[in-house]
């Protein structure tokens, strides 16, 4: 309600009592009428109640005029019906008295001033009151409510529920079968929920685009919610109705209250302590209820009656017809109606929970609920409560916590309402609301003050005069301090602020507000903490709450001071605020150091200065002074100062200014100095005049200091310039971004989504490709990991092998006492221990590394077979060693012997060769005994070797080596002692005896082998010692000689031992040959070498090639037989032993061939040459000899296995063992074949053809062509020279152009004109131009002075008529020459004049004149460049230079869309300005650097218009903008072409990807290749067989042909695949993408992609740090950055995408190349990769087509052959039958006749099928076409031609060569079917006679049938004539009857013999 609404329209002057009594009477009547008419309503309402799904629980009413658009408004009620109260009237005394006294007449509606504006849209529209009742009783009627209101139980929901209600009252929510019903229900919900009203059209379309199922789900959920709420409210309906009836009859006012004046109605009087409030619900049907409140003085407060809206309340009450009290409310708080809260507020009984519920309800409920709350004036009720309880009360009352909470809760509701337009309207309409909010500005609670400030900010958000006035009035209102509880509390707590005031003093709201703000800031603690802070600060939320409050306060101040349009009002407000201390408050706010608040303070200052400036300008305008006119300014100043003391000062000031300026002007100094001086003076005057202080001297000093600070250094100026440039660039970027966004916005509905989807698809494709590449790389990484682990396995194998080799070698030692040393082949104990330790450490380290790598890689590999065997073998050896440790060697260890020495067999050998002394007989037994002992020692050594083979532990080696060395030492001593006695120590004798008794020896060895007790060996050693003592005496005589020989041998042994040590350290795995050599050279003993060989063969798994072959120092006496015997014995022992043999031994014995030993003579030869004086030299020579022998054996094919040093390190033993003689040879041949099978390098290009070969002819041809050109060009010349006598007319082809088409050419060079010799003969003299023209010009133009001179001529050139000219007109229709007469006649009639206008050619005179004027201008460009400008810019020829330059600089759309122009202006030869051109154009050029406007540019020294057009364009663009023109055009080129180039490159990449994917996924292609490989390996020899082939092999498949040269190898492959594996042929369709990518060069594609990305990067760098970064150098009109910057991010994005994609593509491509065995590093291989596949596919298809054609021909041939053979067979059978039949009957003849007819029919059909004309070549087809044409043209002469032909024997074949005697052979040669007979060509005379026709009736029937069948078989195009066919058939039948029955027919027939 508006303020003072009751006073201005009150016409009654009744007393207060009368008014009061009248109100009560009306209220009683209204209550009675409500009680009686509560259930009455319109018929529509009643009917709707009947159809309600729940009876009468929910009442609905028809929609009003503003209701939902889909519902029809009910008809207006008649005058006799009861009308509701007007919504816009207030329930005051005047309105009630009008109802009582019947002052409302007829249909005149009642309105009040305080009604809402009609412009405000409300959810509820009510009909105006129009009552014509005779009585004064008030009736109530339900009015139509808005169906668009989003109430919880609206009419729409109830109507929708009724659709799903069954007759029995149950509700079944099932989806309707009609989708339209679901659409309607969904749309109703959207409107009911107010969703469509708050969404844009596109979002509405998106909602309506939901599927039917989704829409029904939403509808069903809404209906279920409505049903749930309806059922919850049904239970309280009866109680609600009863309590409603009770409340209607309850007396509203129980105490008398007087109304002093109508001002008390619905408003609060500011002067009286008693407040009377009336709350009007503004609804149709009203019910009054009031709550009286008494003040502290005992006065009763009259509360206005409150109207009631039954329909709305009933909706929210679940169907109750009347309102209920709080006690009868249901428990569900969400369904409380607005009237409930209003009643509770009026009764001041609203609890804190209900306040919170009200606040939540206002925020969360639909708008109709809030509208209903506002319509019930709940906000006014809350304002009244606050006014009565806090803001206008007695001083003795205290401000309790409940009151503060109530105030805070009410202000929360106020803030929610202020967010709505209805709430803002109510706040601005009722002064009570603004007063209440203003009172809350200085509340003691910070949150309340903040909310009050926010409410005022919402009111002043938009410039609204009424709201501004309402706020301003409330702020300017005065109040008494003692009436406001907040001020009373502040007065008591902070008396220092109120020292000059009392409780009776009055303050303005604005003062109290600013006081509250300041004391809030003063309550802030130290350094923003709670130390020293006030209670309000501590309880108000801390620092953040203070900051937000200050921010809202400053926002409110700025809104308040800038809301008014009146500058005086704004300045007055600021002045008042500053007087109240706002500046002091701002200073305190600045201490908070909050940016947002400081910004608001700066905004306040800026607005203040702006208003001040406007005010000054307005004051100056009052003096009629033009501030922009200096004369007016000086005149006014002079008028003011004239006649005063200021006159001299003003004159002095002007004089000084003039003198200082004129001095600089006279000195002709630079204008910049004058600018600086004027700037200095202006700055000084500005700072002095604007300063606000009163001290003039201070102002001057400050002004000067400020000026100096601003201009103190050049650095500041430069920085300012740079900042300006940066800001300018940023502005351009922002503008460009704005344009780009606007363009995107314009495209939002036209493809932007599609573009984004395409980009998303591109990224998805790149991601998929990246995933594929990652998978490939992961697979490669897994393979590398496996290889690494396998290498670890191999390393372990090598270490174990070396450790086994080292452990298996016997230990050698020295005998220092006797001074002899054995030849040492192995290391001493310490070195061996060190090596073993190193190997064991390496083995453990390898195991650890393998475990670590396996753990790191997350994968484990099973060891290979060899490693498993080695591990198992070493474990077995360790187990054997443990068993040996348990053996008792105590007796043997007590006699510790010296380290053993090797037996020197070479000495024995030498002794054998010398002359030996005969042995003494008694000594023979000793010798035999010694031999037996040696055999026993050999067995002992064998057993010891067997043990050492499996000995790994060092301790076990030492035990057995000591025993073995002791025996060997004793044996060596014996040999040494008896060496001089001539004893024969030949090993042959020793080895023969074991051969004889092999079985016995083996038995003994088996017995000895079973025992390892050292006592047995000790007994044998004792016997040896005894024999040795006997033989020592005999040895003395040869001791000296033996000593000398021992010294030589020891030297050799030591040297070889040293060499052996070095070799072992250098190479841990020597070759097998070197091992055997080491054993033979170092040990020198048979058993020792055998131990080494045995250890190497069975201990390490290797085969010894020649264990005893290299006997450099001996011939292996006793070793050969002993070797085989011991090996056999050892193998027997090994089989019987518990230690299982290695599984690979059998494999080795199967794969490794046995090595034949060297022959005896070779060994003897070696022995004879052994042991020279120099032992080292002899050893070296022995090695050389061994190597030579090995090579010789390999060459002779005797050596089975040769392994070099490198192969032993790397090759696998099984693989090496396969190399025999044949394999070696095949391997060599394979290698050579592989080398030869590689594709040869491409042949070099053929040399260029020598120029001398064709030089003269080419030169002559060129000269002749030039001559022709000269003739053509000279033919166009307008003024030829007078001609000589004319030669014969030249060919017409030499002269082509008419006169005037081209400008006159330059004269032809003499060289060309004189070159007439050569290919063409000398030409005649040149023809006159007139005759040359006559070849092509119109006959209207004269060809010679004598011809066509009488024809009329046109005044201007016309379009030419091109015709074929007839030169010779004699004896033709043109000879009369009548055309000239017709021309004269037409000319006289004006027809030719009209023709001249109609066919006028385009005028070129203007262009010629322009060109002539242009030629007069200056040009510096070359002719070529000028012509290029004219050609490339021809589309802009109509534009002037300035317009063209402007178009180019502005980057117009048509310019950017012309790629040719952009490309031309980007050419390097165009944009590069040479030094000479720059110097020439310097006077015409303009410097645009730093120029922002065209007017500011310095004009050039010379006028550029003096230059030609091309020069002007070149000057304006390339010269003036040379500093950045190149970069500019590059940027524009990228911007205009990047999308096209990106799409082209992307398309090529897509093709490559498809091809790569096809090749990767095509298993059929791989299968075809495997078929080719299989067939090729079958055809090739073993040396040329391969595991795969390169792609270049595919090209050679067509080179190989079969024996008949009819089919290639590829044809056979295709046939094999098609017949046996037909599915493999699918690779032809799978590899279709490969054919599309053949023409794409991979290298070029990669380079193009790199160039594309690099060009974009270059442009970005140019914009960032390059030539385009400084926009001050640009032309003022240049908009290159605006066009470039928006596009660069998108271009860079595409460049990055393309770069990533090409990288992935190339990775996949190179991986594919590796897959097919190609080298990715070979450029030629990359280029030809896809081409090889494409060629193969094409050749394969061609081969397939050839095969199919050949098979089809073969099939047809076989078919025809079968048919003919069957016919021949039947004919032969018939002949036999006829021959057998002697007397055929007539019936039989008839049957034979029928059979003959059928046979003739069959043969005839066969002949007709095969007798077709053969296909001829196209040349014969052309000949036939020509002949056919000639034949048609001369059809009349055809019969004569046919009659003239001379035919032979009635031939039925028509041929032009019929008269040729050789034609018969030609015909027979060319015809596929031999001719049977030759008859005469049929004519009309040759037809059979009628008598013959009757006789041959059957034959004619057969021929007709044959002819019809022939047409069906061959179609209508078969060139067969009916007569010839008929004659042929008749002749055959005649011949058949004449011949005998048994003869065969002579028709056309194929025969196969």
UniProtKB/Swiss-Prot annotation:
For bias type Basic residues, the affected ranges are 1821-1830
Q: Which SMART domains match?
A: Drf_FH3, Drf_GBD, FH2
Span of domain FH2: 1348-1766
Instruction: Name any Gene Ontology BP term.
Output: regulation of protein localization
One GO MF annotation is: identical protein binding
Residue ranges with Basic and acidic residues bias: 1184-1211, 1257-1270, 1768-1779
Compartments annotated for it: namely:
Cell membrane; Cell projection, Ruffle membrane; Cytoplasm, Cytoskeleton
Query: Could you tell me which residues carry Phosphothreonine?
Result: 1918
**Region called Disordered, residue ranges:** 1-152, 230-258, 263-282, 287-306, 312-337, 990-1014, 1040-1094, 1149-1330, 1768-1797, 1809-1844, 1872-1899
Domain named DAD is located at: 1792-1826
- What does the UniProt keyword field contain? Actin-binding, Cell membrane, Cell projection, Coiled coil, Cytoplasm, Cytoskeleton, Membrane, Phosphoprotein
Q: Locations of Polar residues compositional bias?
A: 41-100, 110-143, 263-278, 1217-1237, 1880-1896
Q: Where is the FH1 domain?
A: 1053-1337
Recite the other comments: Each FH2 dimer contains binding sites for 4 actin molecules. Present with 166 molecules/cell in log phase SD medium.
Entry-linked PANTHER family: PROTEIN BNI1 (PTHR47102:SF2)
The family line of this record is: Belongs to the formin homology family. BNI1 subfamily.
Assembly and oligomerization: Homodimer, and possibly also homotetramer. Interacts with PFY1 via the FH1 domain and with actin via the FH2 domain.
Write out the domain note. Answer: The DAD domain regulates activation via by an autoinhibitory interaction with the GBD/FH3 domain. This autoinhibition is released upon competitive binding of an activated GTPase. The release of DAD allows the FH2 domain to then nucleate and elongate nonbranched actin filaments.
Q: What is this protein called?
A: Protein BNI1
Query: Mind giving the lineage of the organism this protein is from?
Result: Eukaryota, Fungi, Dikarya, Ascomycota, Saccharomycotina
């Amino acid at each position: 309600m508006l303020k003072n609404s009751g006073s201005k329209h009150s016409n009654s002057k009744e007393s207060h009592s009368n008014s009061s009594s009248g109100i009560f009477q009306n209220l009683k009547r209204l209550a009675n009428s409500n009680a009686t008419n509560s259930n009455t309503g319109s018929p529509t309402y009643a009917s709707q109640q009947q159809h309600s799904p729940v009876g009468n629980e929910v009442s609905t009413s028809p929609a009003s005029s503003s209701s939902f658009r889909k519902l029809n408004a009910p008809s207006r009620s008649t005058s006799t019906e009861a009308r509701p109260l007007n919504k816009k009237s207030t329930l005051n005394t005047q309105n009630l008295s009008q109802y009582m006294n019947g002052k409302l007449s007829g249909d005149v509606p009642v309105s009040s001033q305080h009604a809402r504006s009609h412009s405000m849209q409300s959810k509820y529209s009510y009909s105006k009151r129009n009552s014509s009742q005779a009585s004064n009783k008030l009736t109530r009627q339900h009015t139509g409510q808005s169906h668009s209101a989003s109430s919880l139980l609206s009419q729409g929901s109830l109507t929708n529920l009724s659709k799903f209600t069954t007759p029995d009252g149950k509700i079944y929510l099932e989806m309707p079968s009609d989708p339209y019903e679901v659409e309607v229900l969904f749309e109703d919900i959207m409107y009911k929920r107010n969703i469509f009203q708050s969404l844009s059209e596109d979002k509405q379309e998106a909602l309506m685009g939901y599927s039917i199922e989704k829409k029904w789900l939403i509808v069903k959920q809404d209906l279920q919610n409505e049903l749930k709420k309806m059922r919850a409210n049904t239970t309280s309906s009866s109680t609600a109705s009863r309590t409603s009836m009770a409340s209607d009859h309850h007396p509203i006012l129980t105490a008398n209250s007087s109304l002093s004046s109508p001002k008390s109605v619905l408003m609060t009087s500011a002067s009286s302590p008693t407040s009377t409030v009336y709350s009007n619900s503004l609804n149709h049907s009203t019910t009054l209820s009031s709550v009286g409140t008494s003040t502290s003085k005992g006065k009763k407060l009259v509360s206005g009656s409150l109207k009631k809206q039954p329909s709305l309340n009933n909706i929210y009450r679940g169907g109750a017809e009347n309102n209920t009290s709080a006690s009868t409310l249901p428990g569900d708080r969400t369904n409380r109606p607005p009237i409930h809260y209003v009643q509770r507020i009026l009764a001041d009984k609203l609890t804190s929970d209900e306040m919170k519920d009200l606040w939540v309800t206002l925020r969360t409920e639909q708008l109709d609920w809030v509208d209903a709350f506002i319509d019930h004036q709940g906000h006014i009720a809350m304002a009244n409560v606050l006014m009565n309880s806090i803001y206008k009360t007695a001083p003795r009352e205290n401000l309790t916590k409940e009151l503060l909470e109530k105030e805070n809760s009410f202000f929360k509701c106020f803030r929610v309402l202020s967010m709505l337009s209805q709430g803002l309207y109510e706040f601005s309409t009722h002064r009570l609301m603004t007063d209440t909010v203003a009172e809350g500005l200085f509340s003691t609670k910070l949150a309340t003050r903040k909310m009050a400030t926010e409410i005022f900010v919402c009111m002043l958000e938009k410039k609204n005069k009424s709201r501004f006035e309402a706020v301003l009035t409330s702020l300017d209102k005065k109040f008494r301090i003692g009436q406001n509880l907040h001020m009373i509390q502040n007065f008591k707590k902070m008396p220092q602020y109120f020292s000059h005031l009392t409780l009776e003093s009055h303050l303005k709201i604005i003062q109290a507000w600013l006081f509250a703000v300041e004391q809030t800031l003063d309550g802030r603690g130290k350094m923003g903490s709670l130390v020293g802070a006030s209670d309000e600060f501590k309880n108000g939320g801390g620092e953040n709450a203070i900051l937000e409050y200050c921010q809202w306060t400053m926002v409110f101040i700025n809104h308040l001071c800038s809301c008014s349009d009146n500058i005086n009002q704004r300045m007055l407000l600021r002045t008042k605020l500053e007087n109240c201390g706002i500046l002091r408050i701002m200073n305190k706010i600045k201490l908070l150091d909050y940016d947002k608040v400081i910004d608001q303070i700066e905004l306040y200052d800026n607005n203040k200065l702006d208003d001040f400036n406007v005010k000054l300008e307005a004051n100056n305008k009052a003096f009629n002074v033009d501030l922009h006119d200096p004369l007016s300014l000086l005149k006014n100043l002079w008028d003011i100062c004239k006649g005063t003391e200021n006159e001299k000062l003003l004159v002095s000031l002007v004089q000084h200014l003039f003198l200082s300026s004129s001095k600089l002007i006279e000195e002709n100094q630079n204008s910049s100095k004058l600018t600086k001086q004027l700037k200095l003076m202006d700055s000084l005057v500005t700072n002095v005049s604007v300063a606000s202080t009163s001290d003039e001297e201070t102002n001057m000093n400050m002004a000067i200091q400020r000026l100096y600070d601003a201009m103190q250094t050049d650095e500041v100026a430069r920085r300012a310039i740079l900042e300006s440039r940066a800001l300018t660039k940023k502005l351009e970027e922002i503008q460009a971004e704005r344009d780009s966004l606007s363009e995107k916005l314009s495209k939002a509905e036209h493809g932007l989504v599609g573009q984004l989807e395409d980009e998303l698809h591109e990224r998805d494709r790149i991601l998929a490709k990246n995933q594929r590449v990652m998978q490939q790389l992961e697979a490669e990484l897994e393979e590398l990991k496996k290889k690494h682990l396998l290498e670890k396995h191999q390393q372990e194998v090598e270490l174990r092998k070396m450790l086994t080799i080292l452990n298996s070698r016997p230990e050698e030692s020295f005998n220092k006492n006797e001074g002899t040393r054995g030849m040492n082949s192995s290391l001493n104990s310490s070195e061996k221990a060190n090596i073993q330790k190193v190997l064991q450490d390496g083995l453990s380290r390898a195991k650890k590394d393998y475990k670590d790598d396996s753990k790191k890689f997350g994968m484990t590999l099973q060891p290979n077979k060899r490693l498993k065997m080695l591990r198992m073998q070493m474990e077995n050896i360790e187990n054997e060693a443990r068993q040996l440790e348990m053996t008792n060697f105590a007796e043997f260890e007590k006699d510790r012997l010296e380290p053993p020495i090797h037996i020197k067999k070479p000495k024995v050998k030498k002794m054998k060769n010398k002359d030996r002394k005969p042995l003494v007989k008694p000594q023979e037994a000793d010798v035999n005994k010694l031999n037996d002992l040696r055999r026993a020692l050999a067995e002992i050594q064998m057993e010891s070797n067997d043990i050492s083979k499996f000995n790994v532990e060092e301790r076990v080696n030492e035990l057995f080596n000591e025993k073995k060395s002791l025996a060997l030492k004793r044996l060596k001593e014996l040999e040494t002692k008896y060496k001089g006695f001539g004893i024969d120590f030949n090993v042959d004798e020793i080895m023969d005896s074991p051969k004889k008794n092999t079985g016995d020896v083996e038995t003994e060895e088996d017995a000895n082998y079973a025992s390892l007790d050292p006592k047995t060996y000790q007994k044998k050693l004792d016997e040896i010692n005894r024999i040795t003592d006997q033989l020592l005496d005999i040895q003395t005589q040869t001791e000296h000689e033996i000593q000398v020989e021992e010294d030589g041998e020891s030297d050799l042994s030591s040297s070889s031992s040293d060499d052996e040590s070095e070799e072992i350290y250098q190479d841990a795995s020597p070759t097998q040959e070197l091992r055997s050599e080491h054993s033979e050279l170092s040990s020198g003993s048979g058993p020792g070498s055998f131990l080494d060989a045995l250890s190497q063969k069975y201990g390490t798994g290797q085969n010894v090639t020649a264990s005893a072959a290299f006997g450099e120092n001996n011939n292996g006496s006793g070793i050969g037989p002993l070797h085989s015997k011991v090996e056999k014995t050892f193998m027997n022992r090994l089989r019987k032993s518990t230690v299982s043999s290695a599984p690979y031994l059998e494999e080795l014995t199967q794969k490794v061939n046995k090595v034949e030993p060297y022959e005896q003579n070779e060994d003897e030869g070696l022995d004879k040459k052994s042991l020279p004086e120099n032992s080292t030299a002899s050893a070296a020579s022995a090695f050389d000899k061994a190597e030579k022998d090995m090579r010789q054996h390999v060459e002779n094919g005797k050596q089975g296995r040769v392994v070099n040093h490198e192969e032993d390190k790397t090759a696998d033993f099984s693989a090496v063992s396969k190399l025999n003689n044949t394999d070696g040879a095949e391997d060599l041949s394979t290698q050579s074949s592989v080398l030869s099978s590689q594709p040869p390098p491409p042949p070099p290009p053929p040399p260029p053809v020598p120029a001398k070969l064709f030089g003269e002819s080419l030169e002559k041809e060129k000269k002749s062509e030039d001559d022709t050109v000269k003739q053509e060009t000279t033919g166009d010349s307008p003024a030829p020279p007078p001609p000589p006598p004319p030669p014969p007319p030249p060919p017409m082809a030499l002269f082509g152009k008419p006169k005037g088409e081209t400008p006159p050419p330059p004269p032809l060079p003499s060289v060309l004109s004189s070159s007439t010799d050569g290919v063409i003969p000398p030409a005649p003299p040149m023809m006159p131009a007139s005759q040359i023209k006559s070849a092509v010009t119109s006959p209207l133009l004269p060809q010679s002075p004598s011809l066509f001179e009488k024809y009329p001529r046109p005044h201007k050139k016309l379009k030419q008529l091109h015709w074929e000219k007839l030169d010779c007109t004699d004896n033709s229709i043109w000879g009369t020459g009548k055309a000239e007469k017709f021309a004269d006649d037409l000319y006289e009639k004006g027809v030719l004049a009209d023709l001249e206008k109609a066919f006028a050619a385009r005028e070129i005179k203007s262009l010629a004149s322009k060109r002539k004027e242009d030629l007069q201008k200056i040009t510096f460009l070359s002719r070529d460049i000028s012509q290029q400008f004219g050609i490339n810019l021809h589309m802009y020829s109509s534009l002037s230079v300035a317009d063209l330059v402007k178009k180019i600089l502005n980057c117009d759309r048509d310019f950017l869309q012309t790629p040719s122009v952009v490309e031309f202006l980007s050419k390097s030869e165009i944009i590069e300005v040479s030094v000479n051109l720059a110097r020439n154009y310097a006077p015409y050029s303009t410097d645009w650097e730093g120029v922002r406007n065209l007017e500011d540019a310095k004009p050039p020294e010379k006028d550029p218009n003096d230059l030609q057009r091309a020069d002007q364009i070149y000057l304006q663009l390339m010269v003036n903008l040379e500093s950045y023109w190149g970069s500019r055009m590059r940027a524009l080129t990228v911007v205009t072409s990047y999308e096209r180039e990106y799409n082209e490159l992307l398309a090529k990449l897509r093709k490559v990807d498809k091809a790569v994917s096809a090749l990767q996924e095509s298993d059929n292609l791989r299968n075809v290749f495997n078929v080719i490989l299989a067939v090729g390996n079958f055809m090739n020899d073993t040396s040329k067989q391969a595991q795969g082939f390169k792609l270049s092999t595919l090209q050679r498949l067509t080179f190989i042909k079969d024996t008949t040269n009819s089919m290639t190898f590829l044809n056979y492959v295709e046939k094999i695949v098609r017949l046996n594996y037909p599915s493999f042929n699918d690779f032809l369709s799978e590899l279709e993408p490969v054919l599309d990518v053949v023409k794409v060069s991979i290298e070029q594609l990669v380079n193009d992609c790199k160039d594309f990305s690099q060009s974009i990067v270059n442009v970005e760098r140019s914009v960032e740090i390059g030539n385009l970064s400084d926009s001050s150098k640009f032309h003022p009109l240049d908009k290159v950055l605006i066009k470039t910057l928006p596009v660069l991010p998108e271009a860079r994005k595409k460049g990055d995408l393309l770069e990533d994609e090409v990288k992935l593509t190339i990775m996949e491509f190179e991986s594919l190349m590796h897959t097919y065995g190609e080298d990715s590093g070979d450029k030629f291989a990359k280029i030809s990769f896809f081409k090889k596949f494409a060629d193969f596919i094409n050749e394969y298809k061609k081969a397939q087509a050839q095969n199919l054609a050949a098979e089809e021909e073969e099939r047809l041939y076989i078919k025809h052959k079968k048919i003919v053979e069957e016919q021949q067979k039947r004919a032969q059978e018939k002949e036999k039958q006829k021959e057998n039949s002697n007397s055929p009957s007539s019936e039989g003849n008839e049957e034979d006749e029928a059979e003959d007819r059928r046979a003739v029919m069959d043969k005839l059909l066969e002949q007709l099928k095969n007798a077709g004309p053969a296909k001829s070549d196209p040349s014969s087809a052309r000949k036939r076409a020509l002949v056919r044409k000639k034949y048609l043209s001369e059809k009349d002469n055809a019969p004569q031609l046919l009659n003239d032909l001379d035919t032979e024997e009635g031939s039925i074949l028509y041929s032009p060569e019929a008269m040729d005697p050789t034609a018969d052979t030609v015909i027979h040669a060319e015809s596929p079917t031999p001719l049977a007979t030759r008859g005469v060509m049929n004519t009309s005379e040759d037809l059979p006679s009628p008598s013959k026709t009757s006789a041959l009736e059957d034959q004619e029937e057969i021929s007709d049938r044959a002819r019809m069948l022939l047409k069906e078989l061959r179609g209508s195009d078969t060139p067969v004539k009916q007569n010839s066919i008929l004659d042929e058939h008749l002749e055959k039948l005649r011949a058949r009857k004449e011949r005998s029955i048994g003869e065969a027919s002579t028709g056309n027939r194929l025969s196969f013999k």
